[in-house]
A protein has these predicted regions:
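ABC ATP-binding cassette signature C-motif
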Residues: 1-200
Protein backbone atom coordinates (compact mmCIF):
# COMPACT_ATOMS: atom_id res chain seq x y z
CA UNK A 1 0.00 0.00 0.00
CA UNK A 2 1.41 3.36 -1.05
CA UNK A 3 1.77 5.73 1.92
CA UNK A 4 4.01 8.45 0.54
CA UNK A 5 5.38 9.60 -2.80
CA UNK A 6 7.08 12.53 -4.46
CA UNK A 7 7.06 13.53 -8.11
CA UNK A 8 9.56 15.80 -9.83
CA UNK A 9 10.50 17.71 -6.68
CA UNK A 10 12.70 20.70 -7.35
CA UNK A 11 14.01 23.31 -4.94
CA UNK A 12 16.09 26.32 -5.82
CA UNK A 13 17.08 29.60 -4.23
CA UNK A 14 17.54 32.09 -7.00
CA UNK A 15 19.95 30.49 -9.45
CA UNK A 16 21.16 27.90 -6.90
CA UNK A 17 19.53 24.53 -7.56
CA UNK A 18 19.37 22.47 -4.35
CA UNK A 19 17.17 19.57 -5.51
CA UNK A 20 16.24 18.69 -9.07
CA UNK A 21 13.60 16.25 -10.35
CA UNK A 22 13.42 13.97 -7.30
CA UNK A 23 10.75 11.27 -7.50
CA UNK A 24 10.14 8.25 -5.28
CA UNK A 25 7.43 6.15 -3.66
CA UNK A 26 7.24 4.50 -0.24
CA UNK A 27 4.94 1.61 0.63
CA UNK A 28 3.71 0.65 4.09
CA UNK A 29 6.46 -1.13 6.01
CA UNK A 30 9.30 0.17 3.83
CA UNK A 31 12.52 1.40 5.41
CA UNK A 32 14.22 3.90 3.14
CA UNK A 33 17.57 5.67 3.42
CA UNK A 34 18.51 8.90 1.67
CA UNK A 35 22.22 8.79 0.89
CA UNK A 36 24.38 11.62 -0.39
CA UNK A 37 27.31 13.89 0.43
CA UNK A 38 27.01 16.97 2.62
CA UNK A 39 25.13 19.70 0.81
CA UNK A 40 23.31 17.31 -1.52
CA UNK A 41 19.92 18.49 -0.26
CA UNK A 42 18.92 15.59 1.99
CA UNK A 43 17.69 17.79 4.83
CA UNK A 44 15.93 20.11 2.39
CA UNK A 45 14.10 17.15 0.88
CA UNK A 46 13.00 15.91 4.31
CA UNK A 47 11.74 19.35 5.28
CA UNK A 48 9.70 19.50 2.06
CA UNK A 49 8.17 16.09 2.73
CA UNK A 50 7.36 17.17 6.30
CA UNK A 51 5.59 20.26 4.99
CA UNK A 52 8.02 22.69 6.59
CA UNK A 53 9.45 23.86 3.28
CA UNK A 54 7.74 24.48 -0.05
CA UNK A 55 9.20 22.95 -3.22
CA UNK A 56 9.87 25.25 -6.14
CA UNK A 57 7.99 22.71 -8.22
CA UNK A 58 6.73 19.15 -7.90
CA UNK A 59 4.28 17.38 -5.63
CA UNK A 60 4.38 15.36 -2.40
CA UNK A 61 1.68 12.83 -1.56
CA UNK A 62 1.01 11.62 2.00
CA UNK A 63 -1.75 9.06 2.46
CA UNK A 64 -4.88 10.61 3.98
CA UNK A 65 -5.01 10.31 7.75
CA UNK A 66 -1.31 9.47 8.10
CA UNK A 67 0.77 11.41 10.62
CA UNK A 68 4.37 12.25 9.71
CA UNK A 69 6.98 12.49 12.46
CA UNK A 70 10.14 14.42 11.57
CA UNK A 71 13.22 14.39 13.79
CA UNK A 72 15.65 17.14 12.81
CA UNK A 73 19.39 17.19 13.38
CA UNK A 74 19.21 20.17 15.73
CA UNK A 75 16.87 22.47 17.63
CA UNK A 76 15.00 19.65 19.36
CA UNK A 77 13.86 21.40 22.52
CA UNK A 78 12.92 24.78 23.84
CA UNK A 79 11.63 23.29 27.09
CA UNK A 80 13.02 24.13 30.51
CA UNK A 81 11.56 21.00 32.10
CA UNK A 82 13.08 17.65 32.97
CA UNK A 83 13.68 14.53 30.91
CA UNK A 84 10.60 12.75 32.25
CA UNK A 85 8.40 15.84 31.91
CA UNK A 86 9.33 16.27 28.25
CA UNK A 87 8.75 12.61 27.40
CA UNK A 88 5.47 12.56 29.32
CA UNK A 89 4.02 15.34 27.13
CA UNK A 90 3.15 12.61 24.63
CA UNK A 91 0.61 11.26 27.10
CA UNK A 92 -1.15 14.50 28.09
CA UNK A 93 -4.47 13.01 26.98
CA UNK A 94 -4.08 10.21 29.54
CA UNK A 95 -3.45 12.70 32.36
CA UNK A 96 -6.58 14.60 31.36
CA UNK A 97 -8.58 11.37 31.30
CA UNK A 98 -7.24 10.40 34.73
CA UNK A 99 -8.37 13.73 36.18
CA UNK A 100 -11.83 13.20 34.73
CA UNK A 101 -11.91 9.62 36.04
CA UNK A 102 -10.98 10.84 39.51
CA UNK A 103 -13.73 13.46 39.40
CA UNK A 104 -16.33 10.90 38.32
CA UNK A 105 -15.19 8.47 41.02
CA UNK A 106 -15.92 11.11 43.64
CA UNK A 107 -19.31 11.79 42.06
CA UNK A 108 -20.44 8.15 42.02
CA UNK A 109 -19.19 7.56 45.56
CA UNK A 110 -22.03 9.85 46.68
CA UNK A 111 -25.22 7.77 46.53
CA UNK A 112 -27.26 10.95 47.02
CA UNK A 113 -25.87 12.39 43.81
CA UNK A 114 -28.91 13.31 41.65
CA UNK A 115 -26.81 12.60 38.54
CA UNK A 116 -25.59 9.23 39.85
CA UNK A 117 -26.83 7.12 36.92
CA UNK A 118 -25.53 9.60 34.36
CA UNK A 119 -22.14 9.88 36.06
CA UNK A 120 -21.86 6.10 36.44
CA UNK A 121 -22.53 5.62 32.74
CA UNK A 122 -19.95 8.29 31.88
CA UNK A 123 -17.43 6.66 34.24
CA UNK A 124 -17.93 3.21 32.71
CA UNK A 125 -17.56 4.57 29.19
CA UNK A 126 -14.45 6.57 30.10
CA UNK A 127 -12.79 3.59 31.80
CA UNK A 128 -13.44 1.41 28.75
CA UNK A 129 -11.92 4.08 26.52
CA UNK A 130 -8.94 4.53 28.87
CA UNK A 131 -8.23 0.80 28.80
CA UNK A 132 -8.62 0.52 25.02
CA UNK A 133 -6.20 3.39 24.44
CA UNK A 134 -3.50 1.82 26.62
CA UNK A 135 -4.06 3.74 29.82
CA UNK A 136 -2.83 0.86 31.97
CA UNK A 137 0.43 0.43 30.05
CA UNK A 138 1.59 3.88 28.95
CA UNK A 139 3.68 4.54 32.06
CA UNK A 140 5.72 1.36 31.63
CA UNK A 141 6.05 2.14 27.91
CA UNK A 142 7.34 5.61 28.76
CA UNK A 143 9.94 4.24 31.16
CA UNK A 144 10.93 1.47 28.73
CA UNK A 145 11.51 3.75 25.75
CA UNK A 146 13.53 6.20 27.85
CA UNK A 147 15.66 3.33 29.15
CA UNK A 148 16.25 2.08 25.61
CA UNK A 149 17.63 5.51 24.72
CA UNK A 150 19.96 5.53 27.71
CA UNK A 151 17.80 7.42 30.21
CA UNK A 152 17.56 5.38 33.39
CA UNK A 153 15.55 6.35 36.46
CA UNK A 154 18.49 8.37 37.80
CA UNK A 155 18.26 10.74 34.81
CA UNK A 156 14.50 11.32 34.77
CA UNK A 157 14.66 14.48 36.89
CA UNK A 158 17.63 15.93 35.02
CA UNK A 159 16.97 19.36 33.53
CA UNK A 160 16.96 19.42 29.73
CA UNK A 161 19.16 22.51 29.85
CA UNK A 162 21.86 20.34 31.45
CA UNK A 163 21.83 17.68 28.70
CA UNK A 164 24.56 17.41 26.11
CA UNK A 165 23.77 17.75 22.42
CA UNK A 166 23.86 13.98 22.02
CA UNK A 167 21.55 13.45 24.99
CA UNK A 168 19.07 15.94 23.56
CA UNK A 169 19.09 14.05 20.26
CA UNK A 170 18.42 10.77 22.06
CA UNK A 171 15.62 12.31 24.12
CA UNK A 172 14.05 13.79 20.99
CA UNK A 173 14.17 10.37 19.35
CA UNK A 174 12.57 8.77 22.42
CA UNK A 175 9.76 11.36 22.37
CA UNK A 176 9.22 10.76 18.67
CA UNK A 177 9.04 6.99 19.17
CA UNK A 178 6.47 7.45 21.93
CA UNK A 179 4.29 9.51 19.59
CA UNK A 180 4.15 6.56 17.13
CA UNK A 181 3.73 8.50 13.89
CA UNK A 182 2.59 6.55 10.83
CA UNK A 183 5.65 7.74 8.91
CA UNK A 184 8.87 8.43 10.80
CA UNK A 185 11.59 10.53 9.17
CA UNK A 186 14.95 10.84 10.91
CA UNK A 187 17.68 13.27 9.88
CA UNK A 188 20.95 11.61 10.93
CA UNK A 189 19.66 10.35 14.29
CA UNK A 190 22.33 7.65 14.67
CA UNK A 191 25.17 10.11 15.33
CA UNK A 192 24.74 9.77 19.09
CA UNK A 193 23.47 6.18 19.39
CA UNK A 194 25.50 3.16 20.47
CA UNK A 195 25.06 -0.31 18.95
CA UNK A 196 22.51 -1.38 21.57
CA UNK A 197 20.35 1.67 20.88
CA UNK A 198 20.65 1.17 17.13
CA UNK A 199 19.55 -2.45 17.44
CA UNK A 200 16.53 -1.41 19.53
Amino acid sequence: MLVMSAKDICKSYGTDIIIEDVSFSVNKGDKVGIVGPNGAGKTTLLSIIAGENEPTSGDVFIRSGYVVGYLKQKDHFFSEGTVIEEAAKTFTHFYEMEEEISSLEKAISDTNNPKFDQDLEAYTHLMDEYKAMGGYSYKSELIGVLASMGFGADTHDKEISMLSGGEKTRLALACMMLQKPDILMLDEPTNHLDLKMLAW
